[in-house]
UniProtKB/Swiss-Prot annotation:
Leading EC class: transferase
Enzyme Commission code(s) on record: 2.7.7.-
InterPro entries assigned: HSV_PRIM
Source organism (scientific name): Human herpesvirus 2 (strain HG52)
Record localization: Host nucleus
Highest taxon of the lineage: Viruses
GO cellular component: host cell nucleus
Molecular function per GO: DNA-directed RNA polymerase activity; zinc ion binding
Site location (Essential for primase activity): 631, 633
Keywords (A to Z) from UniProt: DNA replication, Host nucleus, Metal-binding, Transferase, Zinc, Zinc-finger
Keyword Cell membrane: no
Source organism phylogeny: Viruses, Duplodnaviria, Heunggongvirae, Peploviricota, Herviviricetes
Positions of region (Disordered): 694-727
Family to which the UniProt record says this protein belongs: Belongs to the herpesviridae DNA primase family.
Protein name: DNA primase
Length: 1066
């Protein structure tokens, strides 16, 4: 029930209407207000009430308790007159200025602060108030003082009067006591005694104001900071249109703090946005007032009080509409949050993809067309809730249909492949099939066990000489000549990166060239052996302690590689009889390998010995792939117990084979019997690594792949099929320098047998794995991009396997498991049974088998022995099916958008909403530069060096001297960027450029490669970026980092100076 007052005769009287009024004066509002409070009318000015809120404290409840929305509207509607002003016999008006009162934490802060309270109860006083509220008539000081409620008013000012009295009258000397209840300000006198003698109320404030006017004014101006606002400030803040000036100002300043709820937490711009969809019909104003003419508070007050939005149903309905609008917004966007929260736990993608997914989800939900549709749906043309014209918004439903439904398809591997993969294959039969396999897979003898090694192996420097000699012999027979590196092309500092790239690609070309008739193959000139058969595997060998070597093998003693990590057949048979369950048998056999602790040769061997310690197969994009070899690098939150890891690998196998069945539909793949071979890098020691942060970069636990922005010599490009050197998920390309080595801090664990249930794996940060899946007959795979697609589909299938995720999900940091950079032409991957070379030159982290036996394996000893068969773990091994197949199918493209649904969606959205992005070729064409013409690109980049050097001088002044005489050499040219290496001049003091990101020790100070990258930025403008690849550990493991980017400017600015001019501000 509402509260009631009683008159002196005991009759019931309704409570007055509560009004909160925001007022202003022509002069200083604080001075005028203090004059009113102290009853000094000479200094008071008339008050303008330009915004107000009204409500009844005795509003009745509905029949079922809390009033309904329509009942609330009717109750508020009864207060606002259609002609302006308020209905009611008496009013309690709280006059406010802008200011903040200290409040409780869980309640929103008020946006206004009350100054005084007046009661308008007599008919004459009510008429004056109605004129002020309905017509904007100024309220005279005499009317304010006549209606002032002294008790309620000075209850508002008691604290500030008390504080001023203590601070001014008693001068607040330094505290000399320490008691919290009775702090002493003078000897023998406590704060309580001081307060007890104070004069509060109107008398106390008047005394202070008369004797200390300046200090009282200053205190009140600080408390009521609204005193400094001008008419222009209010107009610019809440205007400029009439609706927001009236409704948004009233709601934001007065109604939202009173009503509370979500609306009290919305900022002013959000309230103005909601106000824009409150499209209540509005008749033209009878006057000619406009926002530009509101230059005084008198004009603003008259404009606002006579507005149709300040009266009647329009005024009563707006607070209720704000609640409905917020509820509709939250309901529609809540669907987005609900789906994201669900997907956070079940959508197993990499961190980067999940971030892309969140951005895409918000873009799909809040793209301009969808927001426009939503705003049209929530717009109302009638203030009454019962007659509201709002419609259900399709925002959440469309987001689910257009985006989340497709995301759900990613959670089913069959739907994923169906929607995103369109395989393209070519069938070959009979002699054509046999000829293709002979020409595109290793010669059988290369991977057949032999008594001794036969081939060529040498250090990179010597291999360059041998290649040059072989090519000299071949050139008269039509072999393309390799242009020697000219002095001007020298990378400086002894860095032999271009030569190393030349070695790799020239070796791969020689190894893949077929024999023509009776003429020996081209590689015979290198091996000095006319009987050699091609194609041949090419290997990279990390030397100890530094350096690289390369090899091409015609035959090898593979038993020497695997004999100490291969369980005897009798032991396998005995274990299979003792523990026939595949999981338990696999763990037992794996423990036997670990317990034996296979020995590794000491470091410092020659190339012939080192190649049996470390060996990396180099991917040859010209050959067919017969084994899907996956490089897994799993970042861990915590160590994984070996039984759990072994169980997870079983689930990995199942998910991978599910993908293989879908990618190779014509093959017969029995998921319960098909072989899948696992190898794990030996565990790290529990002691901290030897290498410090400034040493050469130590890669991940098993990051064996190679990465380098390819700067190969002439003729390399035609062999660089499907290369993606900017795949930063991969490690750096090897080189002779120690800084480019692929290192790992780990040692072989002690050779002590483990108990059956003990934790064998002690890897705490990362687990490195190699997974080998034979491509099922009758298929082979061709091309780097195709292999990347196969690997990504397999990763998606594995991550959709719930059992795999449950087994290791709590241990894994990032679900980007498979490194696809290893499938680029010229990149290498460490072979099973071989070790890494540590920073001290020692061998560590040998890849040893983990036996995951298929559930329906018919011949366990044969399956275990197959792990040691080199034909099972080489990319281009001769296929295990018939040497003369009736038919083979060459999978040469996966087509579609298998790369990522999110990437596809992002590209489509960018095209739809931001227009077509021009290619780099088109943008460079505006500068008369052709990307395929090396000299023009290098010349144009040289002209841009001036801007780069200017930025370095401004932001890296200590390194500016290094860049005074640099030259530019083309490194890599792709469709969307050009990478050029910056090389110090021959006469420079330092022949290498220093790292700009960190200060390193002397040994690692000059181990950075610096590049200038040209790419297309926003609005199809050409951008020039300075990038560095540093090889110290603290610089993020050899990743290429962009340091800064400058705008190349318009084509007319090609004449930018090439030295030290400042970059343009464009």
């Amino acid at each position: 029930m509402g509260t009631e007052d009683c008159d002196h005769e005991g009759r019931s009287v309704a409570a007055p209407v509560e009004v909160t009024a925001l007022y202003a004066t022509d002069g200083c509002v604080i001075t005028s207000s203090l004059a009113l409070l102290t009853n000094c009318l000479l200094g008071a000015e008339p008050l303008y009430i330009f915004s107000y809120d009204a409500y009844r404290s005795d509003a009745p409840n509905g029949p079922t308790g809390a009033p309904t929305e329509q009942e609330r509207f009717e109750g508020s509607r009864a207060l606002y007159r259609d002609a302006g002003g308020l209905n009611g016999d008496s009013f309690r008006v709280t006059f406010c200025l802008l200011g903040t009162e200290v409040g409780v934490t869980h309640h929103p802060k008020g946006r206004t602060r009350p100054m005084f309270v007046c009661r308008f109860e007599r008919a004459d006083d009510v008429a004056v108030l109605q004129d002020a509220l309905g017509r904007g008539t100024p309220l005279l000081p005499a009317h304010v003082t006549a209606t002032l409620d002294l008790e309620a008013t000075f209850a508002l000012h008691a604290n500030i009067i008390m504080a001023l009295t203590v601070a001014i009258v008693h001068n607040a000397p330094a505290r000399i006591g320490s008691g919290s209840t009775a702090p002493l300000y003078e000897p023998g006198e406590s704060m309580r005694s001081v307060v007890g003698r104070m004069s509060l109320g109107q008398r106390g404030l008047t005394t202070l104001f008369v004797h200390h006017e300046a200090r009282v004014l200053g205190a009140y101006r600080r408390a009521y900071y609204g005193s400094a606002q001008s008419p222009f400030w209010f107009l610019s803040k809440f205007g400029p249109d009439e609706k927001s000036l009236v409704l948004a100002a009233r709601y934001y300043l007065l109604q939202a703090p009173r009503l509370g709820g979500a609306g009290a937490t919305y900022d002013l711009q959000a309230v103005k946005d909601i106000c824009a969809t409150y499209a209540i019909p509005h008749d033209p104003r009878p006057d000619t007032l406009s926002a530009a003419s509101l230059t005084s508070f008198a004009a603003i007050t008259r404009f606002c009080c006579t507005s149709q939005y300040s009266r009647g149903a329009a005024a009563a309905g707006f607070p209720l509409y704000v609640e409905r609008r917020i509820a509709a917004d939250v309901r529609e966007t809540g669907a987005l949050e609900k789906f994201i929260a669900h997907d956070r736990s079940c959508l197993r993608v990499s961190d980067r993809e999940f971030i892309t997914y969140i951005y895409l989800a918000h873009f799909e939900c809040f793209s301009p067309p969808r927001l426009a549709t939503h705003l049209r749906a929530v717009t109302t043309h009638d203030p009454s809730p019962a007659a509201s014209t709002e419609q259900p918004s399709p925002l959440g439903r469309e987001a689910v249909e257009q985006f989340f439904r497709h995301v759900r398809a990613q959670l089913n591997i069959r739907e994923y492949v169906k929607q995103n993969v369109t395989p393209r294959e070519t069938a070959l039969a009979g002699d054509a099939a046999a000829a293709y396999l002979r020409a595109r897979t290793y010669a059988p003898a290369a991977l057949t066990p032999a008594p001794a090694y036969c081939g060529v192996a040498d250090s990179s420097t010597k291999m360059m000489g041998r290649l040059a000699e072989a090519e000299r012999l071949l050139v008269p027979h039509g072999w393309p000549a390799f242009a020697p590196t000219t002095p001007g092309d020298d990378a400086g500092g002894g860095t032999a990166a271009p030569q190393t790239c030349g070695i790799v690609k020239r070796l791969l070309k020689l190894a893949a060239t077929e024999q023509q008739g009776t003429t020996p193959p081209a590689i015979a000139a290198l091996m000095q052996d006319a009987s050699v058969q091609t194609p041949l595997p090419v290997y990279r060998i990390t030397m100890s302690p530094t350096g690289q070597a390369f090899a091409a093998a015609a035959r090898d003693d593979w038993a020497r590689v695997t004999r100490d990590a291969r369980p005897p057949e009798a032991t396998v048979v005995a274990d299979a009889a003792a523990a026939p369950e595949p999981g338990a048998l696999g763990r037992r056999l794996t423990r036997r390998i670990c317990a034996r602790g296979p020995a590794l040769p000491p470091g410092g061997l020659a190339v012939g010995g080192q190649m049996y310690v470390n060996r990396n197969e180099i991917f040859n994009a010209a050959l067919a792939v017969t084994n899907i070899i996956l490089d897994l690098d799993i970042a861990l939150k915590e160590p994984v117990p070996f039984p759990r890891l072994h169980e997870a690998l079983g689930h990995f196998r199942r998910g991978a084979l599910a993908a293989v069945q879908l990618l190779f539909p014509a093959a017969r793949v029995d998921p319960d019997a098909y072989p899948c071979y696992f190898f794990k890098s030996a565990c790290r020691p529990r002691a901290p690594p030897v290498c410090a942060g400034d040493g050469p970069s130590a890669g991940g636990d098993d990051g064996d792949g190679d990465w380098f922005p390819d700067a190969g010599g002439p003729g390399d490009e035609e062999w660089e099929e499907d290369t993606d050197p900017m795949d930063t998920t991969h490690g750096p390309l090897p080189d002779d320098e120690a800084a480019y080595l692929d290192l790992l801090h780990e040692q072989i664990p002690a050779a002590t047998p483990s108990e059956p249930d003990s934790v064998v794996c002690s890897c705490a940060d990362k687990i490195g794995l190699r997974v080998c899946l034979p491509v099922p007959a009758p298929y082979v795979v061709h091309g780097s991009l195709t292999m990347r697609g196969v690997a990504r589909v397999i990763q998606q299938a594995v991550l959709l396997d719930r059992d795999f995720v449950e087994a290791v999900g709590s241990h894994v940091k990032n679900f980007l498991l498979i490194d696809t950079g290893v499938y680029a032409h010229g990149h290498s991957l460490r072979l099973p049974y071989f070790a890494k070379i540590g920073p001290d030159g020692s061998a560590c982290g040998r890849l040893l088998p983990v036996f995951v036996i298929p559930p329906a394996c018919e011949d366990v000893p044969a399956f275990v022995a197959a792990h040691a068969d080199p034909r099972r773990f080489h990319f281009h091994a001769p296929p295990m099916f018939s040497a003369a197949p009736r038919e083979i199918r060459v999978l040469h493209s996966l087509g579609g958008d298998y790369v990522s649904f999110f990437e596809k969606k992002a590209s489509r959205n960018a095209l739809e909403h931001f227009g077509r992005r021009e290619t780099l070729t088109e943008v460079l064409g505006r500068y008369d530069v052709r990307p395929d013409a090396g000299e023009t690109v290098e010349g144009f980049a040289s002209e841009l060096l001036g801007r780069i050097v200017a930025c370095i001088e401004a932001h890296f002044p200590e390194h500016a001297r290094e860049y005074q005489a640099v030259s530019v050499r083309r490194a890599v040219i792709k469709d969307d960027w050009v990478l050029l290496q910056l090389i110090p001049g021959r006469g420079a003091l330092n022949q290498s450029l220093s790292c700009l990101r960190f200060k390193h020790g002397r040994a690692s100070r000059a181990t950075a490669r610096t590049f200038l990258a040209l790419s297309v930025g926003t609005n199809n403008r050409l951008c020039a970026s300075l990038c560095q690849q540093c090889f110290a550990t603290k610089c993020d493991n050899n990743r290429l980092h962009t340091l800064f980017t400058v705008d190349a400017g318009t084509p007319c600015s090609r004449s930018a100076p090439s030295s030290t001019s400042r970059p343009s501000s464009s």
